[in-house]
Curated annotation (Swiss-Prot):
CC per GO annotation: extracellular space; membrane
Membrane topology: Multi-pass membrane protein
Signal peptide (residue range): none
Family that this chain belongs to: Belongs to the KRTCAP2 family.
UniProt subunit comment: Component of the oligosaccharyltransferase (OST) complex.
Subcellular location: Membrane
InterPro entries: KRTCAP2
GO BP terms in the entry: protein N-linked glycosylation
Organism: Ixodes scapularis
Protein name: Protein KRTCAP2 homolog
Domain of life: Eukaryota
């Protein structure tokens, strides 16, 4: 069952805070070995998707259905926040968060194009015809 964009934004924000707190609580376990540091980066990419969802849904709620999330500033801001949150756990988590987030962004964009149609509209030239000025 679908919820409104405002409710979805609040859910994504709450899940972001919950996951961020969980990463901080289990910081020592996430830094104990290299595979766990990679898991920390993966959790950081989940943070990225949650932040991006929250930002996009709040923009849709406040600016209307036709508003689209752009690469700059929304995606970049979400990526910086997720990488900073991952950096609070371990340095390696920053790199793996970036890699996993780029892959996740590709698949989210692919799903969005499939569901909603063309992602970025192409500019089409309108032919200019010479006619009488008095028309």
């Amino acid at each position: 069952m679908a919820v409104s964009s405002g409710t979805s934004g609040m859910l994504a924000t709450c899940l972001f805070m919950l996951l961020f707190a969980t990463m901080q609580i289990y910081k020592s376990q996430l830094t104990s070995s290299q595979p766990m540091a990679i898991v920390g980066g993966f959790l950081g990419s989940v943070l990225f998707i949650l932040i991006l969802t929250a930002i996009s849904n709040f923009e849709t709620h406040f600016f209307g259905r036709n508003f689209q999330t752009k690469l700059i500033p929304e995606v970049v801001i979400a990526l910086v926040i997720a990488m900073a949150a991952s950096g609070m756990v371990h340095r390696v988590c920053i790199t793996t968060c970036l890699i996993f987030s780029i892959v996740a962004l590709y698949y989210v964009s692919r799903i969005s194009i499939k569901v909603h149609g063309s992602g970025a509209g192409t500019a089409t030239a309108i032919p200019v015809t010479k006619g009488k000025k008095g028309k």
